[in-house]
Amino acid sequence: MKIKIICFGKLDKAFYVDAFNDYFKRLKKYVDLEIIELKEEINGELNKIKDENSNLLLKKLENYKDFEKIILDVNSKLISTENLVEIIKTNLNYKTAKILFVIGPSDGYSKSFLNSFTNKFSLAKITLPHQLCRIVLIEQIYRVFKIINNEKYHK
């Protein structure tokens, strides 16, 4: 299975990098995981910034037409680990099992971007820093594969 995570910016604190790398290494035995980091536009009027970042995402997503896309958005439906297990299990049954998660820019997506996708979920009802969101997501993906493979999470 291939999983890609598109996000804005880089992990810039050692503790985030360490946590992320730990889960990344653990996941290698289950999945081909790739992180795609985009440069976020941060200067200008809010709606213009949202449009520019959303357009950048749309252009990047054109390269992944055969992936199931899941947009992470704090205002969308809350997803549970069990929901994520079902999504990944369902995709594992396809020959071309490919999922792409999108962690949006810090100011959010444009309305038109959000309206063009049906798979939108929130990892929490609290606002997470984007770097922490990336770690929570990769940890949940790791947890899902432990569940799918009937393996203990804590050793």
Curated annotation (Swiss-Prot):
EC no. given is 2.1.1.177
Keyword Transmembrane helix applies: no
Give its localization.
Cytoplasm
Q: Which reaction does it catalyse?
A: pseudouridine(1915) in 23S rRNA + S-adenosyl-L-methionine = N(3)-methylpseudouridine(1915) in 23S rRNA + S-adenosyl-L-homocysteine + H(+)
Q: Please give the superkingdom of this protein's source.
A: Bacteria
Q: Which UniProt keywords apply?
A: Cytoplasm, Methyltransferase, rRNA processing, S-adenosyl-L-methionine, Transferase
Q: Where does S-adenosyl-L-methionine bind?
A: L72, G104, L123, A124, K125, I126, T127, L128
Q: Mainly resides where?
A: cytoplasm
Q: What is the designated name of this protein?
A: Ribosomal RNA large subunit methyltransferase H
The species this protein was found in: Mycoplasma capricolum subsp. capricolum (strain California kid / ATCC 27343 / NCTC 10154)
